């Protein structure tokens, strides 16, 4: 009787943004396909891979701590991801790391794994890797990464130095992946990249093919094709190019979710110029007004930075005035933090930490009030809700206005006879600053 060789076991730690999560999913899919077992504890693992984030100082610290924990608990560690682009910084703290690779270096990661934990002999038909690959999200939603890198050179950001210039995935490949996800039961696709609206710019929007039919490599064409899958499609990280106007009618027609995640960063033309971001606030306000006229249900999410070098009280007041006028639905705000390698570090007039904190608090207080007023407008209305969690007390879901992890929730107390992924019609009965409560219609 032949002896069964145990599968080699790999531990995996995934940190950072959804784009990093997709990279982790790809590496895990390859490992599973090759016969490796992915385990949830350090003790059982023959080796640990840590996929890091290096965007801001707190993320760097979290990544370094995760690497240290993996080394202490296991000892055999490979590091990849954004912080991997700064090998010297990692080696200085953790010299015992076996190998370090930068972001989206899938092949290199696998080569290193093969070197330290040789590839097992296995029957590929027994790997049981789902056709859509290994996913780290719940079964009913998934991230669809359409490109890598970014052509912008925002002074606060080091993503281009870590992930390079924009490289768009072939549109046929993207649409085939979307179809596999839907076939596997996914009800909501979240389109992500460093710059979603630039999709196809690097290939001059060339024509690709899907199911034998020509399709233009562009954000608008992609949205039109995804709308045919009959699921929720949500756009993230949309830079405010003029052609963003072209997706608003698709939202109004119900083809994709009326949700736009568009990081604006500031509202002072002077600060936007220092950031190397588009600077016409009046034009942006006019566009927002026009978008809402075309699609009244539109939810606008954005992120801003307070305390950027050189920001005066007058600049900050412009930002508050913009919030009052734009009345955005979902807003995130960060206190400026120097990132190693970012051009903004060299700018004069750095803002004191206590001023950053005070401005952040004023910003959040104002936006909290706006958010509460926007949500109060939904009380008494009927909305669609996708269910995320169910327990003995009821269900928690999200409306079309809520992306997972970053936005609000809809609470359905006593609604236990549903399952994650169900989409219900709900009457909104109560709202606070961020969340809604309601009952199934």
UniProtKB/Swiss-Prot annotation:
Domain Radical SAM core: 136-373
Domain named TRAM: residues: 376-441
Gene (name only): rimO
EC nos: 2.8.4.4
Name of the protein: Ribosomal protein uS12 methylthiotransferase RimO
Catalytic function, reaction form: L-aspartate(89)-[ribosomal protein uS12]-hydrogen + (sulfur carrier)-SH + AH2 + 2 S-adenosyl-L-methionine = 3-methylsulfanyl-L-aspartate(89)-[ribosomal protein uS12]-hydrogen + (sulfur carrier)-H + 5'-deoxyadenosine + L-methionine + A + S-adenosyl-L-homocysteine + 2 H(+)
GO biological process, one term: tRNA modification
Family statement drawn from the similarity comment of this UniProt entry: Belongs to the methylthiotransferase family. RimO subfamily.
Residue numbers binding [4Fe-4S] cluster 1: 17, 53, 82
UniProt xrefs under InterPro entries: Elp3/MiaA/NifB-like_rSAM, Methylthiotransferase, Methylthiotransferase_CS, Methylthiotransferase_N, Methylthiotransferase_N_sf, NA-bd_OB-fold, Ribosomal_uS12_MeSTrfase_RimO, rSAM
Pfam name, any one: Radical_SAM
Keywords linked to the UniProt accession: 4Fe-4S, Cytoplasm, Iron, Iron-sulfur, Metal-binding, S-adenosyl-L-methionine, Transferase
Species: Shigella boydii serotype 18 (strain CDC 3083-94 / BS512)
Annotated positions binding [4Fe-4S] cluster 2: 150, 154, 157
Keyword DNA-binding part of the UniProt annotation: no
Protein's job: Catalyzes the methylthiolation of an aspartic acid residue of ribosomal protein uS12.
